[in-house]
């Protein structure tokens, strides 16, 4: 599961760096990812409320998988910079913002690292469900940084 989040963050940050001059675009209000984000928010919130952290994380990781599939379908790395790439990358950044909020209770340090790399200020732990994780909160116009791997591979 960790690889999925780390790979998603790396892919998005790399594409934003190359195709959007390192500045995160705003998400689309009518993004195809919005439905997956709403579903993840509802399920994750319910599972945290039931004190089922593993199921809460599984619901959060569904959004990561949906975002990876969305990127595979749209292939922004193959497109020329412009409105399509901006839309796809804005949507992916919004999904990462929501993932950071939803995962924060279980993996606070990782969630904060995602939060900062996608250009957001403050503490992800200060965000309150469900309102903070509603679709459309990513501001756009902020610097996105790739940084070191989120989960470095260990040599054994």
Predicted regions and their residues:
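Basic, alpha-helical terminal appendages of large translation-related enzymes
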Residues: 46, 51, 61-156
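Long, charged, mostly alpha-helical binding arms that flank functional sites
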Residues: 1-84
């Amino acid at each position: 599961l960790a690889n999925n989040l780390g790979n998603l963050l790396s892919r998005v940050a790399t594409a934003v760096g190359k195709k959007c001059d390192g500045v995160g675009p705003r998400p689309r209000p009518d993004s195809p990812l919005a439905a997956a984000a709403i579903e993840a928010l509802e399920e994750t919130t319910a599972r945290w409320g039931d004190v089922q952290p593993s199921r809460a994380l599984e619901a959060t990781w569904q959004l990561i998988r949906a975002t990876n599939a969305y990127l595979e379908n749209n292939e922004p790395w193959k497109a020329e910079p412009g409105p399509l790439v901006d839309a796809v990358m804005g949507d992916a950044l919004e999904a990462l913002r929501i993932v950071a909020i939803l995962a924060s209770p279980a993996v606070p340090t990782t969630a904060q690292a995602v939060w900062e790399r996608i250009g957001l200020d403050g503490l992800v732990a200060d965000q309150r469900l469900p309102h903070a994780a509603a679709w459309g909160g990513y501001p756009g116009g902020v610097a996105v940084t790739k940084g070191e791997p989120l989960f470095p591979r260990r040599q054994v």
